[in-house]
Structures are given as structure tokens and as C-alpha cells.
Amino acid sequence: MIKKSTLALAAAVAYHSAPGFAAGTSGSGTITFSATVIEGPCSISAADSNMTIDLGQVSQRMLNGPGKFSDSVPVVIHLTGCSFDEDTGTTPNPNGKLSKVAVQFLGTFTNTQLGKISSTGTATAVAVQLLESDGTTPVNLAATPSAANAKQLINGSNELRYWARMSVVGGPGAVTSGTGSVQANATYALAYF
């Protein structure tokens, strides 16, 4: 009789302690949420706040020679929730106040006129070239944002489209590059007009 009571008690204890034991060994973690509240009339998509653009693994032969580049890869900044106040100025913008945006890129550049961003990787004489939305015109990295070079936005969602590719450092006469990694960084800042 004592054996049956002990067995029943042991089974009851095991049954009631199993969920606690299982929950303790299931794992846990921390979730950190971050965001920034900005003044601009548009929000920047969370996926575009800190982008990583993969330009691929490119043969050195593809880059060696004047005017040679890697294939271009799209770089898109998504603006969401754009909403503009009515423009009541002397020459009002029918789309509203601050409904134009210009992008300024900040960083270390090897050639601002040709849109070339310096690489800190191990590949020698290679830069990342940033192109306008047409895919051929280099972004002038020295340009100051102004209404003249700003893009007209609409209410709702908008895309700011650019292209990136690898290029040899220097101008059209630069012809050689070395193998290795390419790492380039630029920060973008939006200016509304």
C-alpha cells in the first residue's frame, strides 16, 4: 500500500512540475524595438533605414579597362505615408508645401563628379559608383541639395531610385583593379523643398 501511495505521489509531482521544467528549458530572448520620429512629410521605410546592397562577385577582368564596370544593381529608398500641406505662396506648388525632395549622399569619395564612393575593402583601385535613376548618369556627390535638383513627390508612397556598380578608382583613363573585398559606406540625407 505504501508503494502505491508513493508511486501515485511521485507521478503527481512529476506531472505538475513537467510544464515548469519544460518552459524553463525552451529558451528565451530579448526583442529590442527602435525607431526615430522625424519632421519630414514622408516616412522612410524601415527596410531602407540601413541598407546593404550586394554588388556580387565580379571578375577582375570585367573591371579592368577604361569605361568598364560591374553590372548595375538597384538602390531604392522607399518613402511612405507622404502628406503635404497646401502651398499658399506666390507661386504655389499644386502638390503642396515641401512636396519635392533632394537626396544628399555623405561619406568618403574618390571622385565626387563621377559618383565614386571610396572602398575600405582589400580590393585595390576599386570604388562603388552611384548612378542616377537613368542608370547611366553619375550622381554628383558634391552637389548641394536644392529645389532645382529635387524630385516631385505625390501623396502616399514614392520611390527614390538609384543604381550602384563597381568601377575602377579615378576617371575614364583608369584601367586596373586588384582582387579582394569591396566595402563602401555612404549616408543619405533628405532635404524637402
What residues fall within each predicted segment?
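Mature extracellular/passenger domains of Gram-negative fimbrial/pilin and adhesin proteins
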Residues: 2-6, 15-16, 20-193
